[in-house]
Structures are given as structure tokens and as C-alpha cells.
Amino acid sequence: MAEIVLPTKALAVNPLKTSQPIGASLAFLGLARTMPLEHGARGCTSFNKLFFMRHFNDPIALQTTAMDQVTTIIGADDNVVEALATICAKDQPDIIGLITTGLSEMQGADVPRTVAAFRAAHPHFAEVAVVPVSATDTLGCLETGYALAVEALVDFLVPKALVDFLVPKRRDNLTRARQVNVLVPAMMTPGDVEALRDWITAFGLHPVMLPDVADSLDGHLIDEGFSTLTYGGTLRADIETMHQSQATLVIGRSLDRAADRLAERTGIADFRFAGLMGLEACDTFSSTLCDIAGIAMPPAILRKRSQLMDAMVDCQFQLGGARVAVAADADLLASLTRFFHGMGAEVVAAVASARAAHLAELPVDEVVVGDLEDLEWLARDKSAELIVANSHGAEAARRLGSAHLRTGFPIYDSYGDHAKAWIGYGGTRRALFETANLLATHYQEIRPYRSRYWQGTRREKETNPC
């Protein structure tokens, strides 16, 4: 059991966490023909949009209610109604995600009442689903905001079971053959989600991914050239069939509450996994798919498993005993920590952006809830060879002279990293090779001493100072 160490500093010096509204917006960006609408100031939403654009290198559909100093005091309900009506009239979306921010939460905005006022004033937009999410900036992190959005999507868009799901025969009549629900966590990249879909379909199953960022944020050109709404993602019509699925697969402990809500509404049995990185986690997931599909392990999956095992043998000497420092949101931190621990590496520092109860189960002495400054201090104190963090950890890695493995959100200083697959047999194998190569090619050398009396050329003195 790991000890969870809470922060004692008065402020975050080098912030690790990203706000809840960004996480909630990310969840809606994984739905087809959707517009996330943040109820807050224009500048805050612009900053969030810039975060997404730098990470994904693509246009991002994101709007704001544009609260200002006047509406912050006297109320911004009219802004919300006007924004919803404008988006419905101009863009004709299937779904609008109405996300509160720290500003509107501190103001005390009554979002459900405002949505009711919009419905009363504009009944002709009744077909557009408006999903409100309470996601203040002052609590949680990207992962928790994302989880709140998924929970809201389940509550507002997944129909309740119309028959008694305790009666098997009556339920079987409405079950869609071989369809499974998949609750996808915030830690998964577009590459991860694509790999997960292929993994499930290899067993002859049809997954309904909620949400599906692989179909909307994987970086692809469209014939229209530009769309004001999300292009690609989970269809609203597919979400409305989730109560007829055969089973539900839940990835990540952050989605436990959303999984509970889905089980309450549909009565469908669910299978929960902390992560899908590493041989043991992959084997557990594959065995579950075998049980659901009622088939033996497909040869293609067995082939990938054998490739991963070979990679583990190849990389054991480089990763065994390596000293690693990891900083991420809770789900990703747990997945990476177990991955490195399974390969014989020593996780000397584990820093989470926000507190989560399941972090106590990790195979480390302590998990610090803090920022990247905490990571840097711990990594320096324990001589970490590898820093695993988002792009904001690059400066800490440079100062420490350690290798830097980029993962999480945001990644803005490396092309293609946002789309890498980390999960499954193939993703774990790729992560093994990348980590081993980083450690093998990164040398923490001591610079040679040069006497002040050394006689050398001006160029040599510039490149090799005393």
C-alpha cells in the first residue's frame, strides 16, 4: 500500500494538472456533430482552445458564453440562452455540451434552470440534446472533468431499460447481438482508442465507444475542408442503443461512477479494468473478451502477445533497475507505474495531479499529490534516470540531465506523440522499445574540466569553457 502525501505548499510552482472544463470539453470532442460550450469568460475558453490546438495540431470546435464583468455580477443566464440558440441555428449540432467553469460556478449559475428557459423560449430546437456538466476549475483535474462529462452523457442520452433486466429471456429479446459498450478514459490517446477498437473487433464484437476521440481527433482531412462541429466520433444514435448491449467494458478507475450510473440505467453487466498496459493487464482483458464472445483467443492476438514477450526479454537489461520518476493524472499514473514495476524498473517518484483513493494500491512507497516542482525535487533526491511527464516536464528533465518520455496532456513540443498507442500488446511493446532506447542513448556525463590557463582556440574555448 502506498502512502498518499497531500500538498502543503501555498501554491503550485510548476503546475501539473489541467482544469476540469478542459477534461469535460475533451469528452464532448469525442462525439460526432457536437459543440462543447463553456459557460465562462471568453479568455478562459480561448486559452483552453489553444491548449487543444497545440496538442492535437488540428482545428477544435469549442464555444463560450463570453461572460464579462457585468454579466458576472448581475447574471449570465441570457448569455447561455442566446449562445445555445445561436449554435442551434447556425450549426445544427446533434449534441451541445454545456460546461460550467470556475467563474460561473462561483457566480452560482443555475444551469438546469437556464436550459429549461432555453427549451421554453426555443421549442423548435427540441431535437438538439443539451448536456449540462458542472466542472469547476477549483476542483479536480482534466481526468475528473472528463469523468463528469461521461457521467452526464450516460444520464442524459442513454435510455433506461424498458423491460425488467432481471428476467433473462425478456432482456435477450432486446439485446443487440455482440454489441458491447466501452467507457473510454481520459488517459487514452486517439491511437489508444483506435487500438482498443481493433482489439475488440478481433473477437467478433461490435464496440460502442463513449467517447471516441480516435474517430474525431486522430488528425485526418475531410472533404468539406473545415467543419464548425466535431467531425467524427461516437454518433448520438449509437449512444441511444447502449441499453441494448451485451456487456460493458470500463477502462480506468476514474470512470467508476459513470459505470455505476450506466449499470443502474441498463442492468448490463460490466467488467472494469484499471488500465490496459503491460502483459498481465492485456491478458486479463483478452480473457474477458474471450468469455464475452464465446470464442478462443484469435491467432492475431496470440501473435501480438508473443511479440510483446520477446520485447520484454530484449529490453529487460535496459529497464531492469532503472530509476523512473512519473507525473500524471491518477489513471495514467497508475497504469505507467504498474508497467514500469512489471518490467523491473524502480519508480522512485510518483506525483499525481489530484487525489484519488485507488492510488494507495500502487506498488510504490508513496504517491505525492503535487506539481512538477515536487517531481523535480524527488527525482533529484533519488537520482532518477528517466522523467515521464507531459511537455511541461521538459525543463525539469533538462535541469536534472535525465531522459524525458512524453506522455499525458498536453504534448506540444513533439510531433505525433499525442496519437501514439500505449495500450494493448502492440502499444506496450512500442512503449518498451521507446523507453529502452531513451535510456540507452541518454548519457549523464560529467563535463571535462578545463584549466583557466588552457591554451586553445577561441572556438574551442566557446564550446568547452572552463
Model-flagged regions — what are they?
Residues 1-466:
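An N-terminal assembly and electron-transfer interface module characteristic of large anaerobic redox
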